[in-house]
């Protein structure tokens, strides 16, 4: 059978989006891996599935697969594309929608200026909820990586993140430390790794090594996690701007117990069909 799909991106973090509300198909990890190959498939960072909800209190179910076939809990840039997609496809007329993810319920708002705001919910900082192996909760942790001690913050935005502060974003050890921390045994579900350079109290630069995808042009949950880490440690103030290789996100967080708000663009690239 042929399935209609849309190619989208949020600041260069690119997605294949499938409407499984009006189309019916059983998508498996092998399909994500096959379609995700940039040489022999469609090519993307993540596959986003738009499904009818299981929960009557939400509008849609949102599932996410990495290009290696692994299913993940959350994707912030994908959430903005999800909101743009369901409105463009007339799956809803609402400008504010509630979406069920593997990592919890999020709220999406399409603003009059075309930007999309996502209420990502409160961050999780308790180690076992991230999950991260630590004796007790702290603002930062020391991690032994090949005999080198690395200082990092650990945050869950529905998916696990480690955040490291660096002095030079261009020479950050994204491709050397990134995969080692991703697979570190103290992160039992693996982890996304953010390298954060604080420019001033309102602006920072960020590069992210994404679990199962490698370095991407942008990572929405990574930007949220970096903002939480920076505000928690007194480096920055809310609201703040985070510049990623693909562009800029605005993040707001009022502190523990409060939701993280992320605002940025979502862009449709093309429509296509793929054989299942």
From Swiss-Prot:
SUPFAM superfamilies: Diaminopimelate epimerase-like. Pfam families: DAP_epimerase. InterPro entries: DAP_epimerase_AS (IPR018510), DAP_epimerase_DapF (IPR001653). It is an enzyme of class 5 (isomerase). One of its GO terms (molecular function) is diaminopimelate epimerase activity. It catalyses: (2S,6S)-2,6-diaminopimelate = meso-2,6-diaminopimelate. It is found in: Cytoplasm. Its EC number is 5.1.1.7. Pathway: Amino-acid biosynthesis; L-lysine biosynthesis via DAP pathway; DL-2,6-diaminopimelate from LL-2,6-diaminopimelate: step 1/1. Substrate binds at residues 13, 46, 66, 76-77, 159, 192, 210-211, 220-221. This is Diaminopimelate epimerase. The record marks 161, 210 as: Could be important to modulate the pK values of the two catalytic cysteine residues. Keywords: Amino-acid biosynthesis, Cytoplasm, Isomerase, Lysine biosynthesis. Its main location: cytoplasm. It comes from Pseudomonas syringae pv. tomato (strain ATCC BAA-871 / DC3000). GO terms for cellular component: cytosol. Catalyzes the stereoinversion of LL-2,6-diaminopimelate (L,L-DAP) to meso-diaminopimelate (meso-DAP), a precursor of L-lysine and an essential component of the bacterial peptidoglycan. One of its GO terms (biological process) is lysine biosynthetic process via diaminopimelate.
